[in-house]
Amino acid sequence: MAFLQISEPGQSAAPHQHKLAVGIDLGTTNSLVASVRSGEANTLPDMKGNVILPSVVQYQDDKICVGANAYQSAASDPQNTIISVKRLMGRSLKDIQTRYPDLPYQFTESDNGLPVIHTTQGDVNPIQVSAEILKSLSNRAEVTLGGSLEGVVITVPAYFDDAQRAGTKDAATLAGLNVLRLLNEPTAAAIAYGLDSGQEGIIAVYDLGGGTFDISILRLSKGVFEVLATGGDSALGGDDFDHVLSQWIKDQAEITTALSNQEQRELLTLATETKVALSDADSVTVSFKEWSGTITADIFNQLIQSLVKKTLMACRRALKDADISSEDVMEVVMVGGSTRTPIVRRSVGDYFAKTPLTSIDPDQVVAIGAAIQADILVGNKPDTEMLLLDVIPLSLGIETMGGLVEKIIPRNTTIPVAKAQEFTTFKDGQTGMMVHVVQGEREMVEDGRSLARFSLKGIPPMTAGAAHIRVTYQVDADGLLSVTAMEKSTGVQSHIQVKPSYGLSDNEVATMLKDSMTYAKDDMKARALAEQQVEADRVIEGLVVALNNDGDALLSKEEQTVILQAVEALITVRKGTDTQAIEDGIKHADEASQEFAARRMDASIRAALAGQSIDEV
């Protein structure tokens, strides 16, 4: 006899069975994988007992090498050994060459403008390189856990934009992984820290990794993680310490000629080793080519002081966004290997006036938090134990007539979120509408960041203002934006998923936020002027059409002249920048045409009732 196993919809046939899920910290310098076993979240080691996998991929003639072995080949085979690929994710070739001119790779540009790296195995893109790192981590997890993974949570910097997040998802798909969620790195750290220590209150998560910096201000209360504000820089990290130090060594060695790719990699490797050594020593002797010298911790601190100060400026902005002071912060959590640098810990401690918490390994805390979240999302733990509220860093809006920005989703709104707003047509008979998606805090489109454009066609021809177009902005849990425009009477709609072609650094974010405050008054004046100009255009076009259609039938020549003079006066002031003059011109045109409007209304009613009896009416 055969038995049919029955289970509740959406549940496992064996609900007691533990599903295998992991959290992956896909870092710029190093990557880790962690999982929850027997209620404890721990990072998973490789066969040699190492939990950290260097984020390095080497392409050899007959195989691909990932991790420590690949890193050892960086100096001898720099063109085929890809390091810090996370920095390249979602960026254009032009952007990469501007930001990182010293990279030893042979780049070419693909048809879509994205970078391709030439290796001995052919051309590869950053997504393919990242996929190799993810494959290595997932293989390690499956060997350690003894089964196939049902899902993964992958962490990303809070300031990764849509293209960078989408690229990370694509890399996971290429690696054969089921992505349960992309999780902001500081939020993952908060999960690990909050659950392990049972803290409640305001916590600052200071995350300085190899290639990115993030600061998150979070409120932890009764298992609820709410991100009050985020800040940071997607192009600042320990790698920059290495570059500054390598430049100092070049200057000391009086090297003026260009270095070969191999020499450049050797220099960066030397700088990295020197930086690590200075975390525990007051001075280190270094040698490069024919030069040998000593660098002290004080010199190193001076070299990186401006970079550390940039992180503290981001902390200040995040606190201001959260509307709290540094005194309100209960604890400061340090995340990322670069926070081991003594001057970083001292500077952060001085700024927040408290000793930063380092009880959880700063290299492992993000992976541990991701593992806890993965364990919940895969169904091993009731998700009611924790609520996670991320936020979007910059407002999302739409361009309206006059080059104005109508904000749909304000910055620091918790995600996932969906918001809709209705718009209408500007001209009679308009059958299409261009939807321009913009990002930023300014009032005018020209001062914001353009994300995407798409057209909605098939709008039924109607009088201006009669059509109703509903525009919906939806940001999912991974921070990806989808925009839909629908004409309500017909249901015709158009849709786009926004994927910018390059990243948005915190310097640009900070500039956009600073400008929105600096130019707030000017922006409001510009907006008021643009609004009056749009209204003037509407009045002018409406009166011109009305006069052409009904002027001779309903008005005398003298009456037409009065209205035309008002229209011409409005056209004249419309060209200027005096908001009040335009408003007065609109008012004068309205007053001059009131009788005309009344006669048109009467004529329309008579035409509608012509031939009908009182009973029919």
Curated annotation (Swiss-Prot):
The keyword Nucleotide-binding applies. Keywords: ATP-binding, Chaperone, Nucleotide-binding. GO terms for molecular function: ATP binding; ATP hydrolysis activity; ATP-dependent protein folding chaperone; unfolded protein binding. CDD domains: ASKHA_NBD_HSP70_HscA (cd10236). InterPro entries: ATPase_NBD, Heat_shock_70_CS, HscA_NBD, HSP70_C_sf, HSP70_peptide-bd_sf, Hsp_70_fam, ISC_FeS_clus_asmbl_HscA. Gene3D superfamilies: 1.20.1270.10, 3.30.420.40, Actin, Chain A, domain 4, Substrate Binding Domain Of DNAk, Chain A, domain 1. Belongs to the heat shock protein 70 family. Chaperone involved in the maturation of iron-sulfur cluster-containing proteins. Has a low intrinsic ATPase activity which is markedly stimulated by HscB. This is Chaperone protein HscA homolog. It comes from Aliivibrio salmonicida (strain LFI1238) (Vibrio salmonicida (strain LFI1238)). The lineage of its organism: Bacteria, Pseudomonadati, Pseudomonadota, Gammaproteobacteria, Vibrionales.
